[in-house]
């Protein structure tokens, strides 16, 4: 779905078809929206849904076997995603932020031009490093994030190591487009994704 200034707008695809997407952008502009955050699927990149849309920054989290019904191989899937990061592609974003926690991320960082790199596994040389310091019974995690010369500690209510990587990437993307990291991080304490790793508590003695 889509949300514009707190109002839910029903949409069905991860990335809407081009006419719908541009209509949404036009509505946002009329309503005074200045920034858009969206998920761009490999389908959208391959099928022209974001053609003519200029992106300030793009983030790459990871690559897994999610869409092999559409892509015949992982290599084809990677090449589709690379359209968003390769400076030779007409679809590439102005800035790239890439999580290098796996081989696909490391490879994408080599494709992109001057990417900001994010790591959660203690890698040397990354631009943004995140570490889980601990977690409570609800799954909420204490996270330390090093960005440039600054170190931040915050509570992330979303469980799972992948959400530490997602949060670090989001902070790095926000910083790349001029958002104050401290202000952005303060909002992570209220982050939730309904239906995704959502805790259900009905009084049971298990999570």
Locate each region found by the language model.
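Short beta-strand-centered segment that lines the nucleotide-binding/catalytic pocket of NTP-utilizing
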Residues: 1-3
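Short acidic, glycine/proline-rich loop/turn micro-motifs
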Residues: 6-10, 156
């Amino acid at each position: 779905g889509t949300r514009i200034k707190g109002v839910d707008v029903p949409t069905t695809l991860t990335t809407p078809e081009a006419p719908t997407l541009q209509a949404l952008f036009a509505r946002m502009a009329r309503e005074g929206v200045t920034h858009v955050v969206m998920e761009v699927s490999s389908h959208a990149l391959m099928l022209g849904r974001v053609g003519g849309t200029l992106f300030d920054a793009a983030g790459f989290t990871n690559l897994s076997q999610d869409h092999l019904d559409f892509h015949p191989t992982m290599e084809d899937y990677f090449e589709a995603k690379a359209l968003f990061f390769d400076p030779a592609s007409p679809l590439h974003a102005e800035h790239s932020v890439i999580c290098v926690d796996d081989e696909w991320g490391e490879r994408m960082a080599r494709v992109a031009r001057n990417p900001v790199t994010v790591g959660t596994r203690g890698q040397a040389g990354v631009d943004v490093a995140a570490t889980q310091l601990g977690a409570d019974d609800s799954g909420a995690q204490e996270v330390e994030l090093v960005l440039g010369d600054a170190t931040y500690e915050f509570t992330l209510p979303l469980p799972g190591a992948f959400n530490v990587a997602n949060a670090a990437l989001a902070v790095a993307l926000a910083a790349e487009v001029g958002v104050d990291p401290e202000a952005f991080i303060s909002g992570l304490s209220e982050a939730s994704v309904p239906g995704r790793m959502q805790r259900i508590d009905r009084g049971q003695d298990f999570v």
